[in-house]
UniProtKB/Swiss-Prot annotation:
Homodimer. Within each dimer, one monomer is responsible for RNA recognition and catalysis, while the other monomer binds to the replacement base PreQ1. Keywords: Glycosyltransferase, Metal-binding, Queuosine biosynthesis, Transferase, tRNA processing, Zinc. Residues 248-254, 272-276 are annotated as: RNA binding. This is Queuine tRNA-ribosyltransferase. PANTHER family: QUEUINE TRNA-RIBOSYLTRANSFERASE (PTHR46499:SF1). Gene3D superfamilies: Queuine tRNA-ribosyltransferase-like (3.20.20.105). One of its GO terms (molecular function) is tRNA-guanosine(34) queuine transglycosylase activity. Its EC number is 2.4.2.29. Zn(2+) binds at residues 305, 307, 310, 336.
């Protein structure tokens, strides 16, 4: 299921692959977010051309906006969306818990009010697994509580215990799965920013021996130093035989630091989100295309990029589209940013294989931090 091809000589970075039901996924892996089964503004063909073999979809949104019965009629999410590569589906717990005034937690699950239409629902750990089984998800993520930065120890302890209980019940559900379904369950560790809670959570999750481990509840508004501290601490407790997934990170510097600590998989909607403000990822920093200096700029956004934008259109034209709020501008910018992320990951893999990750990381982060990145 999981194999490591090369470990970096100096750090914990590594290159390898996961064998999943819908094909091989090379690691390190950046996973684009396709909340409803598609990335905003992009055809599946764009991702397929980039050899994207793993996309994240959101159980919360699919359940509430589409309905489980519809997916069941199509015999799974792959048939419904015609995406023939792998899906990782998360529980949507982060979304539920972001509306603290609209939900109530108990030992079995969470009662919540849908913020769009006011309807009431109840998610349980077993129910969330059953939904994702119907989806035919290649990687299933259980229901968990992603707690906020700054809460007190007692609250963090309670949420950590509940998350562990939910993980245990989800694991039991995975042992009674439908015949023929062979998706993998990755369990999530929590603990907020308290090291003893992190350690206990990881040890409890490891006892269940799921195929993969996710580190949840970081990159939630904490200072970067605290993020790195907990990331390193958590990594050291997870066996190297397990694929490691950090949830919700996707900016270049966060990815490079995660790979440095031995993280294999990450996801983030940031590359698509920042295009709404005309922000483009480049090797020279984030380009804010809305600036006046680009109004009459006839050059391409980036010379070495082969996305539709960089092959055909000028900076000035893209600025015009973004300023005019033309959807086509967002589509072009989104495709460019996804191209950039996959190109970056490809360079990182090559650097690890060539024993050059130290130089690559140092030079990239130096340039990154010198530039004016408006995230």
């Amino acid at each position: 299921m999981f194999s490591v091809i090369k470990n970096d000589k100096h750090f914990n970075a590594r290159v390898g692959f996961l064998n999943l039901p819908h094909g091989r996924v090379d690691i390190p892996c950046f996973m684009p977010v396709g909340t409803l089964g598609a990335m905003k503004g992009l055809k599946h063909a764009v991702l397929e051309k980039l050899e994207c073999n793993l996309m994240l979809a959101n159980t919360y949104h699919l359940y509430l906006r589409l309905g489980i019965k519809t997916v069941e009629k199509y015999v799974g999410l792959h048939n419904f969306t015609t995406w023939n590569k792998n899906f990782l589906t998360d529980s949507g717990g982060f979304r539920v818990f972001s509306f603290s005034d609209l939900r109530k937690i108990d030992l079995k699950g969470v009662h919540f009010k849908f913020h769009i239409d006011g309807s009431y629902h109840y998610f349980t750990s077993e129910g969330i697994f059953a939904m994702q089984e119907i989806f035919g998800s290649d990687i299933i993520m259980p229901l968990d509580i992603c707690s906020s930065y700054g809460i007190d120890y007692n609250e963090a302890n309670l949420y950590t215990n509940i998350t562990t209980n939910w993980a245990s019940s989800t694991f039991k559900s995975s042992k009674n799965r439908k015949e023929g379904y062979n998706g993998l369950l990755f369990l999530i560790t929590q603990g907020n920013f308290f090291k003893d809670l992190r350690k206990r959570s990881i040890n409890d999750i490891l006892e269940l021996d799921s195929p993969g481990i996710a580190i949840g509840g970081i990159s939630v508004g904490e200072p970067r130093e605290k993020y790195l501290e907990i990331l390193e601490y958590s990594f050291l407790l997870i066996p190297k035989e397990k694929p490691r997934y950090v949830m919700g990170i996707g900016t270049p510097h966060y990815i490079l630091n995660a790979i440095y600590y031995g993280i294999d998989i990450f996801d983030c909607f940031n590359p698509a989100r920042i295009t709404r403000h005309g922000s483009l990822l480049t090797d020279n920093g984030i380009m804010c295309i809305g600036r006046k200096e680009y109004k009459d700029d006839t050059s391409k956004v980036e010379k070495n990029c082969i996305c539709t934008l960089c092959k055909r259109y000028s900076r000035g034209y893209l600025r015009h589209l973004i300023k005019s709020k033309e959807l086509f501008g967002i589509v072009l910018a989104s495709e460019h940013n996804i191209h950039y992320m996959f190109r970056l990951i490809s360079k990182i893999r090559a650097a690890i294989l060539n024993d050059d990750f130290l130089n690559f990381r140092t030079s990239y982060l130096k340039k990154y931090e010198e530039e004016n990145f408006d995230e």
